[in-house]
Amino acid sequence: VRVGGDWAYVCLLVDLANRGIVGHSAGRTRDASLVLGAFAALDFPLTDVQETGVCRPEGSAGPSSRILTLGDNSMQADRVRETERINDAFLEEVVPFAVHGATIVDARGMTKNGWLVSDGRSIVETGCAETDFETDFETACRLVHVEQDHIVNANGMVMTPGYVDIHSHGAWGSSFDDGEKGITTARAGHMAHGTTRQVLSLITNPIDVICGNLKTVHDMMPDRPDILGAHLEGPFLAMSRKGAHDPNCLVDPTPDLVSRMLDAADGCLRQITIAPELPHGIDAIRRFFLAGVVPAVGHCDADYQTARKGFDAGAGIMTHMFNAMNGLHHRDPGPIPAAVEDPRVTIELINDGFHVQDPMVKLGFGLAPHRIAFVTDAMAATDCPDGHYLLGALDVDVRDGHARLASNGAIAGSTLLLEKAVSRAVLELGISPVDAVEAATLTPARAFGFDRRNDVTGFPIGLLAPGFAADVLLLDQETWTVRRVWCNGHPVR
């Protein structure tokens, strides 16, 4: 299908069946108007069609191609408004605010009937109402001039730091590879559910496309404090463990390619996943590390010794442990023990009950306490109806919330939100609230040094403590559903 001169797939989510595809053209090129006209001729006109995502096959010289969707018109309109509102929130001046009557949960522990005061950018004081409410809370509010309208009674809700997702690809029908509009939409989808900061994961693509996507992330960061930078999941992956990545785009990380990516990123590249067994894998890990990037071992078929060499060369993360890698075996241990035994390594885990079964999630917390980082690996279909979507240039079918490649059934990312990862850890797996919240806040922040003052976030993130950024969530105490969100002091929900 061709839309506006660019190769594209047109995905029409018809509300009658809640799904429907007008896909690959057969023998002739069709544009969007012809597709819509065909439906009108069948007395089934489609209205309120919206551009919601993009992709670009290898070799295309124009901008990324478009996905057009039609579903619940009111939901689409609501999400457009919500995206605009969240984007505009970062243009507003922050004001001091305070919260009391909450159960505070962060990596340090749990405090009943707790309170917090912020000057609008950072947290200035926290405490417990049972011992110091009349004096310290009111004094802190006066010192930073909190107006009465900006004092929130949490009425027993759970208060946590904002969630930090260091590995996700999109939401709300858009991907982080989709340009500024796609990033804005997908970020809104995650922000609405409590992910206040995010490293934007970019899928495997031709090198020039990857470099262009890195530039887009770089250019957006000054105006969007919620964007922490980019993660390249590809193209330096093992062919045997490619997962849902385009095999035609996988390459060895030669010195020239490393240079091109570092130049294109201009400081916005936070993480890059590399299979260490590739011919230039270890050298590339070392080079990225020296450039200030955190390399990650993943999508690999590395033996134990090679994985250890990767971590010793500077890799500080294991990309979604258990997925897209050789597993544990008593005579061929592989990369997982190398990550688990190394205290320098942060270990990503997708806690959706599908990518990793619950016993293995709990095993991960036992093997590497305080080093498990919940990630979503979420793709464009996140928080959307089941149907047909794209991951890069690859067709994806989503059924029962599970995303698989249409071509071979390989898992193609998730539709998970960190909100769900935390709530299911606490309510279904029996993981302690402190450990679950730590895995979605302090641990991922610490992987990049964001748990201390830095040039990206300014104030540290990951705790509800004085001097930390005003990233604050209020959660329903029964369901752990996100109800209120502040990001960098901005009230975004």
Place the predicted regions along the sequence by residue.
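Divalent metal-dependent hydrolysis catalytic cores, especially in the metallo-beta-lactamase
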Residues: H169, T184-N213, D226-M239, A265-E277, ...
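His/Asp/Glu-enriched, well-ordered alpha-helical/loop segment
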Residues: P337-I347, F365-L475
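Active-site core of metal-dependent hydrolases
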Residues: S259, D263-P385
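Active-site gating loops and adjacent loop-to-helix segments of metal-dependent hydrolytic enzymes
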Residues: A188-V199, A238-D266, R308-M321, M325, ...
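Charged DNA-binding/catalytic regions of mobile-element recombinases
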Residues: V1-A77
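N-terminal metal-binding scaffold of metallo-dependent hydrolase/deaminase domains
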Residues: N73-R142, T479, H490
